Amino acid sequence: MVVSVQEIGQRAKTAATDVAGLTITTRNDLLRQMSQALLDNQSAIMAANKEDIAAYANTLSQPMIKRLTLDQPTIKAIATSLLAVVALPDPLAGPFDTWQTHVDLKIVKRVVPLGVVAMIYEARPNVTIDAAALTLKSGNAVILRGGKEAIHSNTVLANILRDVLRDNALNPDIIQLITDTSHESVNVLLNMRDYVDVLIPRGSAKFIDFVVANATVPVIETGAGNTHIFVDQSADQKQAIAIIHNAKTQKPAVCNAAEKLLVHVAIAAEFIPKITEKLVRAHVELRGDQASHQLDPRISLASEQDWDTEYNDLIMGIKIVSGTNDAIDWINNHTTHHSETIISKSSENVAQFMNQVDAAVVYQNASSRFTDGFEFGFGAEIGISTQKLHARGPMGLPALTTIKYEVFGQGQIRE
């Protein structure tokens, strides 16, 4: 029986009370069992995943197909990531701030779950597991709504996790998947203020903008990464080439991959042919401004739209800038506030870049590919927030909690 999105919300609200009451011992034990259940059901997972890939093999890019694929090494890595979440501290544990007021009221500032967390995401079935693990560990119920491209994979994964809850005589609706992949299901979810405490979208900039513009439930913006690398005049060019190559080509379809390259004019004539050669060999299509195109004809002319596009593919934009001020101004006009990088030996320029670039994560001399919950030591991540309220940057367990004030008295009344 297909359950309506509204009914899923109602069930999640009930389940939120159930999961909030679980001890950390129980939550961790469930995660261990879920990890093993994924390993025990690899054949079913891969069979479902093959259905998804077969359905979209001709419409998705190769990087997107790679994100969609669940093979044995990937499933093992996902199962291992659950054990990494087990090893993390309980986000709901104390010590809590406690104080006495002037009328001898005792106030305790507790950390508590958000309640019902809804996730909307595109063709990344690993997010199903990451989101379920982090919400369970932090005492939340979760509603998952993945993209149609991964519906078979997500359904099998969610059922495996729900079966573990059932096997432990717990409410399986602590973890729910919306199997209706229509736009209408998204529209309903965006407006379930009575049931959803926070909505976290993961996907393209266009998709996230749609969610923010149309949701009445609280939203944490995540993910879109029109990420820049600025190569300063003082940069170690060999180091810069290695960083750019890694940030662009290692996993081009993820939000922390580099999309744009800014090069200081003083080194452009020397550096641009070098980086062009390296990237062209890696099958990266280059689109640049007139100045970079003149330095190397392998760089085609970029359109105005290119500068604001997150490619999620082996494509990169290149622009020559006059210096640090110019780079900062350009980035702040085109950034999605995710991750931005400067490659420089100048402490003055680095300090200015770090201070003035408006992004959740700012790097010196390192690949933006490290913007990741696991790499930051948070375990898995629920997403990478590009906004400033509640959470910013890679969101681990603390981002899935809020506070509650408990006040203890002995009959006090306010005069």
Curated annotation (Swiss-Prot):
User: What CDD domains does the annotation carry?
Assistant: ALDH_F18-19_ProA-GPR
Q: In which pathway does it act?
A: Amino-acid biosynthesis; L-proline biosynthesis; L-glutamate 5-semialdehyde from L-glutamate: step 2/2
Q: Name one GO molecular function term.
A: NADP binding
PROSITE patterns per the UniProt record, alphabetical: PROA
Superkingdom to which the source organism belongs: Bacteria
Q: Report keywords, A-Z.
A: Amino-acid biosynthesis, Cytoplasm, NADP, Oxidoreductase, Proline biosynthesis
Q: Which GO terms describe its biological process?
A: L-proline biosynthetic process
Where in the cell does this protein reside?
Cytoplasm
Per the record's keyword annotation, is Cytoplasm included, yes or no? yes
NADP as a keyword?
yes
Enzymatic class: oxidoreductase
Q: Which Gene3D superfamilies match?
A: Aldehyde Dehydrogenase, Chain A, domain 1, Aldehyde Dehydrogenase, Chain A, domain 2
Pfam families, from UniProt? Aldedh (PF00171)
Catalytic activity as recorded in UniProt: L-glutamate 5-semialdehyde + phosphate + NADP(+) = L-glutamyl 5-phosphate + NADPH + H(+)
Q: Which InterPro entries match?
A: Ald_DH/histidinol_DH, Ald_DH_C, Ald_DH_N, Aldehyde_DH_dom, G-glutamylP_reductase_CS, Glu-5-SA_DH, GPR_dom
One CC-aspect GO term: cytoplasm
EC assignment: the record states: 1.2.1.41
User: Which family does this protein fall into?
Assistant: Belongs to the gamma-glutamyl phosphate reductase family.
- Purpose of the protein: Catalyzes the NADPH-dependent reduction of L-glutamate 5-phosphate into L-glutamate 5-semialdehyde and phosphate. The product spontaneously undergoes cyclization to form 1-pyrroline-5-carboxylate.
Q: Output the PANTHER family linked to this UniProt entry.
A: DELTA-1-PYRROLINE-5-CARBOXYLATE SYNTHASE, GLUTAMATE SEMIALDEHYDE DEHYDROGENASE
The protein here is known as Gamma-glutamyl phosphate reductase
